[in-house]
Regions:
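Conserved acidic carboxylate
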Residues: 9
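Two-component/phosphorelay signaling modules centered on CheY-like receiver
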Residues: 12-29
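Acidic, metal-coordinating helix/loop segments flanking the phosphotransfer/catalytic sites
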Residues: 30-48
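Acidic catalytic/metal-coordinating carboxylates
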Residues: 33-36, 59-63
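Short amphipathic alpha-helix used as the core "switch/output" element in two-component signaling
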Residues: 39, 62-75
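Alpha4 helix (beta4-alpha4-beta5 surface) of REC/receiver domains from two-component response regulators
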Residues: 63, 86-101, 114
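C-terminal output helix
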Residues: 107-116
Length: 122
């Protein structure tokens, strides 16, 4: 069975990079805002969500992650946070929000693919 991956990223170029990096792992669904991301999480029930920590317009990927993990219908979904914020406190905040993994930008397409594949296999 094909895996389903939801990419939540507000920047078009990064959304495309993540999509190209992960397309071999399954069916890709895209969202460009926190609200659209949560709507698609509930409707699509993806196996993995890649989630930008800062989604623009004051939206926080950490809040989206908390919402995913606090809802019994979606708590099982793996979340991979992506952020340019690489301080230890940022990583800890992401993991405390419920993320299964945290990657610091910039990253290579290969390292993103490997991290996503590991989460999908877990």
């Amino acid at each position: 069975m094909d895996k389903k991956i939801l990419i939540v990223e507000d920047q078009d170029d990064l959304r495309l990079l993540v999509r190209l990096s992960l397309k071999s792992l399954g069916r890709i669904v895209l969202a460009s805002s926190a609200a659209e991301g949560l709507e698609k999480v509930r409707a699509e029930q993806p196996d993995l969500v890649t989630l930008d920590v800062w989604l623009g317009k004051g939206d926080s990927g950490l809040d989206v992650c908390r919402a995913i993990k606090s809802d019994p219908a979606t708590a099982h979904i793996k979340v991979l946070l992506l952020s340019a914020c690489g301080q230890q406190s940022d990583v800890e905040a992401g993991l405390q929000a419920g993320a299964d993994s945290y990657m610091i930008k910039p990253f290579s397409p290969q390292s993103l693919g490997e991290a996503a594949a590991a989460l999908l296999a877990a």
